[in-house]
Amino acid sequence: MRIEQTLNVTDAFTRTLVTFPSDGLTIYGFMDVPRGEGPFPVVLVLHGYVDPATYNTLTYTTRYADALARAGYLVIHPNFRNWPPSDNGPEEYRVGQAVDVLNLIGLVKKQGGQPGPLQQADPEHLGIWGHSMGGGISQRVITVSDGVDAAVLYGAMSGDEALNHQRILYFTNGVSGLWDEAPPDDVLQRISPINYLDRVTAAVSIHHGDQDATVPPAWSDDLCQRLQALAKPVECFSYPGQPHTFTGDGDQLFIQRVREFFDRELKAS
């Protein structure tokens, strides 16, 4: 990882623009490092879909990253490939973005606690937080990696790629989906994280607004029930009156619950 520039210094943390390599691509993002000696548990904050033409590194999820930094977490917020100024690269089924996260996890595990940008990172305590598209990417990550201790899924896309494809077609009036030509059903089943939940080792915290008109709340309900049936450590919350991105008191309650979840899973051990 490389620090490109300092973006902001607050009373609680320092925010820097960072880059890291991922399969030959350069991925940008920001990192919030709390004041103090550390080591600090690490949380990767994964943003939802924003039109790349209007995307800014300090996007809407910055407030969630900052709240975690103020609570004593070293937060890394990657832009993902194909979101500027990161390089462009393959992303079919959004596997490419999951690869970026997996490479970032590997980097934290290798460089955390060592001299350099991640010296204050605790590589043994790592969580991920994903909203919408980022929540879908998080599901893929926790089904293939045991390097994540805790995962927050917030208004998350489905682990069933057929459902995601249909939803994206709906939003784009049939212009685009996750693929141009539908893969065979057996391939679709193999690439869908929903079919590999038995591999999840992370504790999971699911949050969804019951007035979400973007991602159906039923998708989170289904995921919650599947994880419970597998006896996985999971907690599930529905937020009355809240849309896809929370506001007001519901947003503050969500931030509080996330902090308590990560404190329990990443700081107590």
Where are these regions (language model features)?
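N-terminal cap/lid segment of alpha/beta-hydrolase-fold proteins
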Residues: M1-E37
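Short substrate-entry loop that stabilizes the transition state in hydrolases
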Residues: G38-F40, V45-D87, D160-E161
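Mobile cap/lid helix-loop segments that gate and shape the active-site cleft of serine hydrolases
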Residues: T54-Y55, D149, A156-Y196, A202
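Alpha/beta-hydrolase active-site loop
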Residues: E92-G116
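Short glycine-enriched nucleophile-adjacent loop
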Residues: G106, G135-D146
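Alpha/beta-hydrolase fold nucleophile elbow
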Residues: P117-S132
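Short beta-strand/loop motif that positions the catalytic acidic residue
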Residues: V200, I206-H208, D212
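C-terminal catalytic histidine-bearing segment of alpha/beta-hydrolase fold enzymes
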Residues: D221, Q228-S269
